[in-house]
Amino acid sequence: MPPSGLELMNGQVLPAFLLCSALLVIKMYVVAVITGQVRLRKKAFANPEDAQRHGGLQYCRNDPDVERCLRAHRNDMETIYPFLFLGFVYSFLGPNPFVARMHFLVFFLGRMVHTVAYLGKLRAPTRSLAYTLAQLPCASMALQIVWEAARHL
């Protein structure tokens, strides 16, 4: 039987999930700040009022480096948000603490490598391998959640 919510708070699973989650959200903020800095450095603004403030409407334009940052951030949203849900629910299933921590750590490290590979323009297939590696624990957690939910129908 899974431990009670009180035991989970004192256990090792939920705190590990919360740590990884908070670090991933901070990483997303860092990518957003980097995007803003690249916009300023490249003078490539999405909105006319921003371009006007920084030199004129000619700077309301796209830039490949800004677009790369935006894609990295969008990819974070496509993967980290589901992880936040899956990891939270998974934490309450009473998983083995070591296995759960490995799920969270593999996802966290995969996303860190993915971001470095994306923003650093590292050679393929670094980014896609990091992406795939990070998706494995999510798939595992999702299947375990589905299994537990179906078992209790």
Curated annotation (Swiss-Prot):
Keywords: Cytoplasm, Fatty acid biosynthesis, Fatty acid metabolism, Isomerase, Lipid biosynthesis, Lipid metabolism, Membrane, Oxidoreductase, Prostaglandin biosynthesis, Prostaglandin metabolism, Transferase, Transmembrane, Transmembrane helix. The keyword Transmembrane helix applies. It holds the Pfam family MAPEG. Glutathione binds at residues 39, 74-78, 114, 118, 127-131. GO terms for molecular function: glutathione binding; glutathione peroxidase activity; glutathione transferase activity; prostaglandin-E synthase activity. The record marks 50, 127 as: Essential for protaglandin-E synthase activity. Pathway: Lipid metabolism; prostaglandin biosynthesis. It comes from the Eukaryota. GO terms for biological process: cellular response to interleukin-1; prostaglandin biosynthetic process; regulation of inflammatory response. It is a multi-pass membrane protein. Its EC number is 5.3.99.3, 1.11.1.-, 2.5.1.18. It catalyses: prostaglandin H2 = prostaglandin E2; 2-glyceryl-prostaglandin H2 = 2-glyceryl-prostaglandin E2; prostaglandin G2 = (15S)-15-hydroperoxy-prostaglandin E2; 1-chloro-2,4-dinitrobenzene + glutathione = 2,4-dinitrophenyl-S-glutathione + chloride + H(+). Terminal enzyme of the cyclooxygenase (COX)-2-mediated prostaglandin E2 (PGE2) biosynthetic pathway. Catalyzes the glutathione-dependent oxidoreduction of prostaglandin endoperoxide H2 (PGH2) to prostaglandin E2 (PGE2) in response to inflammatory stimuli. Plays a key role in inflammation response, fever and pain. Also catalyzes the oxidoreduction of endocannabinoids into prostaglandin glycerol esters and PGG2 into 15-hydroperoxy-PGE2. Belongs to the MAPEG family. Homotrimer. This is Prostaglandin E synthase. It comes from Bos taurus (Bovine).
